[in-house]
Amino acid sequence: MTSQSQGIQQLLQAEKRAKDKLDEAKKRKGKRLRQAKEEAVAETDQYRMQMEKDFRLKQAKIMGSQSHLSDEIEEQTLEKIKELNGSYNKCMESVIKQLLSMVCDMKPEVHVNYRATN
């Protein structure tokens, strides 16, 4: 009987050691998973920061060029307005004279398509 109880005790001890090893392996696995998760979060944060930095640089570059274009368009518009005002002042007198002569100097004529019926 003692040999049986010794065998049972050995089996129980072996089972306990196996359970302890499994528990230790589960703990190591959990620790590795937490560490991998932390590394992944750190890596994604670093990637996000780099992408945001690149985006801000590109945005600043584009906005700067748009500002330059808007200044250029404003300058061209002012030049065109000055040109049109100069043309207006130069031609205003002759256009008014021509318009008044067309309205005031009437020359009655018979239309070419008019047929006299007798």
From Swiss-Prot:
Keyword Ion transport: yes
Residue ranges, annotated region (Disordered): 1-44
A single GO molecular function term of this UniProt record: ATPase binding
Coiled coil (residue ranges): 5-53
Basic and acidic residues composition-biased segments: 14-26
InterPro entries recorded: V-ATPase_G
Secretion signal span: none
GO biological process: proton transmembrane transport
Keyword Coiled coil: yes
Cellular component terms per the entry's GO annotation: cytosol; membrane; plasma membrane; vacuolar proton-transporting V-type ATPase complex
Tissue expr: Kidney.
Keywords: Coiled coil, Hydrogen ion transport, Ion transport, Transport
Polar residues bias spans: 1-12
PANTHER family: V-TYPE PROTON ATPASE SUBUNIT G 3, VACUOLAR ATP SYNTHASE SUBUNIT G
Subunit structure, interactors included: V-ATPase is a heteromultimeric enzyme made up of two complexes: the ATP-hydrolytic V1 complex and the proton translocation V0 complex. The V1 complex consists of three catalytic AB heterodimers that form a heterohexamer, three peripheral stalks each consisting of EG heterodimers, one central rotor including subunits D and F, and the regulatory subunits C and H. The proton translocation complex V0 consists of the proton transport subunit a, a ring of proteolipid subunits c9c'', rotary subunit d, subunits e and f, and the accessory subunits ATP6AP1/Ac45 and ATP6AP2/PRR.
Biological function: Subunit of the V1 complex of vacuolar(H+)-ATPase (V-ATPase), a multisubunit enzyme composed of a peripheral complex (V1) that hydrolyzes ATP and a membrane integral complex (V0) that translocates protons. V-ATPase is responsible for acidifying and maintaining the pH of intracellular compartments and in some cell types, is targeted to the plasma membrane, where it is responsible for acidifying the extracellular environment.
Family that this chain belongs to: Belongs to the V-ATPase G subunit family.
Protein name as catalogued: V-type proton ATPase subunit G 3
Annotated organism of origin: Mus musculus (Mouse)
